[in-house]
UniProtKB/Swiss-Prot annotation:
Regulation: induction: Regulated by the Fur protein.
Name recorded for this polypeptide: Prophage DNA-packing protein NohA
Pfam families: Phage_Nu1 (PF07471)
Family to which the UniProt record says this protein belongs: Belongs to the terminase small subunit family.
Additional remarks: Encoded in the Qin prophage.
Length: 189
């Protein structure tokens, strides 16, 4: 939606001066500006810019706090002290923010989502596989029933494997994590 400076200020509950400051900081302008021309903004683009800017500011604050705490060496911190607990909390917040950013940018996804998607795809594949014996029988009527039955048996095995995918994913994830930890642990070539 196209909005002018006043409308944008109303959307954000900010002053027109704040909008001008944001524009100087890189907020996207749709068109206008200059001598006597009203500046227009795409509200969706501005909201996206604002959210990204807000996340960057928050990340920078957390990074600074983590760096300050790292400077006060971790070994100097005593468990149970306020400094120690603050350090733990700040690190946890920084880790959580990094994970959230990775999730928002689709660098990581939830295991439940992967399970859902792969199970859905496996179901569609199973449906296609189910029709193959009949298609083969119609296309090649000269085939004996034993040939079609052989094909059906192997297809049923594949369909069962696909149907069990949602049950296999947690085990495969554990196997992947073990292999990844071994790789990260120093067995790199």
């Amino acid at each position: 939606m196209e909005v002018n400076k006043k409308q944008l200020a109303d959307i954000f509950g900010a002053s027109i001066r704040t909008i001008q400051n944001w524009q100087e900081q890189g907020m996207p302008v749709l068109r206008g500006g200059g001598k006597g021309n009203e500046v227009l903004y795409d509200s969706a683009a501005v909201i996206r810019w604002y959210a990204e800017r807000d996340a960057e500011i928050e990340n920078e604050k957390l990074r600074r706090e983590v760096e300050e705490l790292r400077q006060a060496s971790e070994t100097d911190l005593q468990p149970g002290t306020i400094e120690y607990e603050r350090h733990r909390l700040t690190r946890a917040q920084a880790d959580a923010q990094e994970l959230k950013n990775a999730r928002d940018s689709a660098e990581v996804v939830e295991t439940a989502f992967c399970t859902f998607v792969l199970s859905r795809i496996a179901g569609e594949i199973a449906s296609i596989l189910d029709g193959i014996p009949l298609s083969v029988q119609r296309r090649f009527p000269e085939l004996e029933n034993r040939h079609v039955d052989f094909l059906k048996r192997d297809i049923i095995k594949a369909m069962n494997k696909a149907a069990a995918l949602d049950e296999l994913i947690p085990g495969l994830l554990s196997e992947y994590n073990r292999a990844d930890r071994q790789y990260a642990g120093g067995s790199r070539s």
